[in-house]
Structure formats: structure tokens, C-alpha cells
């Protein structure tokens, strides 16, 4: 969650994620945006890890699972446009998931996302990052969404429930 990460730490993370017997998707955010000198671009990632690298939403098909995982990245520390703007998952009978960094009902510079955009997205589930507190499972329209929070607080201003969602 920052641009000043030791390469050894990133390599250890890549090895750990490579040991997970499942696909892993990463949507870089405002503190770790994707760029040519980011830890994401400068690291050899295992085949099971996909890092979203553009502000445009892209989809990755998971053959045999009837599922598409969509996502996008911050490529600069600020984004005043909703990453969901103009997105609609195709109504094709598949499960459509998305990983994004953004601020639900936010008005600021960190990917503001309106609840109406979530409801209109056609997604099955939207996995969000940015808010370091657990939101619990929420629903907008037919789309479930959640912030898991961070695994542990990074300061005394980040107390309360923490965790991950699997």
C-alpha cells in the first residue's frame, strides 16, 4: 500500500501468491498506482497472478468456471472519474466479478463510485479497495459489494474490525 516498497518484499509476495492454487487479481490503487516504475511492472509475477494495469476496465475469462473477472487500475495517485462509468457487464449467463479501487458515494479524487453505478453494472460481486474499514457485505440493485478493510490497522486512526474476504 505504498510506492516505497523493498523489491525483496515484492518478490516474497509474488512467490507467496504463486503458491495459491487459484487465480489472484490485483487492482492497484492510489497509494500503489500502476506505472512503468511501479513494483507491479518491475516484477516477474507467477502465471496465476493478473495485475490490472490500465484505467480502462478489462475482463479476464476463467475458462471452465463460467466466470469473468473485470478490473482496472489507478495509474496516477488521483482519479476523479468513476472507474465504473459506462461499464455494464454483458448479460450472457456468466458470473461477472470486478476488483476496483474506489470510494463508494465519494465525491473526491479517489475513484468516486455512485451506488446507482454499482446497481446498473450487472456485476455479481464488486470487490473494493480504498476504505480501510470493513463494510460488511452490501447490495446495490442485484450487485453485492464490499470493502474488506485492511488486514491490520496502519495507525491509531485505523482501529476496529479488520480482515479479508475470501
Where are these regions (language model features)?
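His/Asp/Glu-rich metal-coordinating catalytic cores
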Residues: 3-162
Amino acid at each position: 500500500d505504498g510506492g516505497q516498497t523493498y523489491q525483496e518484499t515484492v518478490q516474497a509476495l509474488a512467490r507467496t501468491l504463486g503458491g495459491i492454487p487459484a487465480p489472484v487479481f490485483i487492482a492497484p490503487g492510489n497509494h500503489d498506482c500502476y506505472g512503468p516504475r511501479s513494483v507491479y511492472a518491475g516484477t516477474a509475477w507467477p502465471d496465476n497472478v493478473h495485475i490490472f494495469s490500465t484505467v480502462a476496465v478489462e475482463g479476464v475469462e476463467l475458462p471452465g468456471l463460467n466466470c469473468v473477472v473485470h478490473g482496472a487500475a489507478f495509474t496516477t495517485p488521483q482519479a476523479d472519474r468513476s472507474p465504473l462509468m459506462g461499464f455494464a457487464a454483458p448479460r450472457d449467463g456468466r458470473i461477472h466479478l470486478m476488483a476496483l479501487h474506489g470510494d463508494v458515494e465519494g465525491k473526491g479524487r479517489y475513484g468516486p463510485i455512485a451506488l446507482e453505478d454499482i446497481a446498473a453494472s450487472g456485476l455479481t460481486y464488486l470487490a473494493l479497495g480504498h476504505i480501510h474499514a470493513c463494510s460488511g457485505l452490501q447490495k446495490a440493485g442485484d450487485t453485492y459489494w464490499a470493502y474488506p478493510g485492511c488486514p491490520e490497522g496502519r495507525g491509531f486512526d485505523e482501529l476496529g474490525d479488520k480482515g479479508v474476504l475470501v
